[in-house]
Amino acid sequence: TMAKGMGNGFPIGGISIAPKFKPWHGMLGTTFGGNHLACAAALAVLEVMEQDQLMENAKAVGNFLIEELKKIEGITEVRGRGLMIGIELPADQPDVKKNLLFKHHIFTGEARPNVIRLLPALNLTMEQAGQFLENFKTALKG
């Protein structure tokens, strides 16, 4: 299933199934299925993603971030794909996420108490990624 980003804030959801499963009429039913406005919003998102080459950008900026994060001392592991990145820290560094938020105004997710999850917008620039890295290094120091 997929949702959220499909409509860039407009409520929509979807499902994709493997070709080996043959859908039939009536197999899936939804309360709001076939909403024309939601479909138009999703189509507009796809058009912007293609026009602005957001997938290519996410791959390039994501690879840059992952490689640069791997160079920073104090990080246990960096894993991810594109701009979905997990930064695992030693358990004795509980304040990094708090420092990022309160000192640098950077909101991050959390996969576990010692794993910071990054999931920025697909149009994140290299410059913004560089700014994040500098702030992250400072947040690690306290």
Please describe what each predicted stretch is.
Residues T1-G142:
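Conserved N-terminal phosphate-binding loop of PLP-dependent enzymes in the Aspartate aminotransferase
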